[in-house]
Amino acid sequence: MIPDRIIEQGTLRTDGPRAAVEVRLPWYRALPGSCIAGAELTIDGKTAPAESLRWEMNGAEFTFDELRTNIDEWWFPTDSAVLSGDLDIEADAEHEVTVGLTLYIPYIIISDTETLHIDEKNTKTMKAVAA
């Protein structure tokens, strides 16, 4: 619902074959990890392989399979999470970064078997910093 603030400007990092960027919750209320259904990280038109994606929040790192059942870790609108994936990018260069998020909103029921889900994307250009 607030897609223009998903990517934190100036947070693109590269560490060998991996790239990472800080992201913010595009929703106005906190969500448990189980509501983070998926993400996509694309830099300069190249998308990180889904199996390489990792999500870090509250000091812990997760695969999206691990998040699927996680109700103990919560993502708050005031906190940044880190999305990383296998993308070998050049440090000290400008890159176009796109992050896509799919979130489930558990308290908005839209049918007998379904809750609201939102798909949001944000693109920003920023310089990568070596980790």
From Swiss-Prot:
It holds the Pfam family CGDB. InterPro entries: CGDB. Its cofactor is a divalent metal cation. Optimum temperature is around 40 degrees Celsius. Keywords: Carbohydrate metabolism, Lyase. GO terms for molecular function: lyase activity. Its EC number is 4.1.99.-. Optimum pH is 6.0. It comes from the Bacteria. It catalyses: 3''-dehydroisovitexin = 1,5-anhydro-D-erythro-hex-1-en-3-ulose + apigenin; 3''-dehydroisoorientin = 1,5-anhydro-D-erythro-hex-1-en-3-ulose + luteolin. Heterodimer composed of an alpha subunit (CarB) and a beta subunit (CarC). Belongs to the C-glycoside deglycosidase beta subunit family. Carbon-carbon bond-cleaving enzyme which participates in the metabolism of C-glycosides. Acts on the C6-glycosylated compounds 3''-dehydroisovitexin (3''-oxo-isovitexin) and 3''-dehydroisoorientin (3''-oxo-homoorientin). Shows weak activity with 3'-dehydromangiferin (3'-oxo-mangiferin). This is C-glycoside deglycosidase beta subunit.
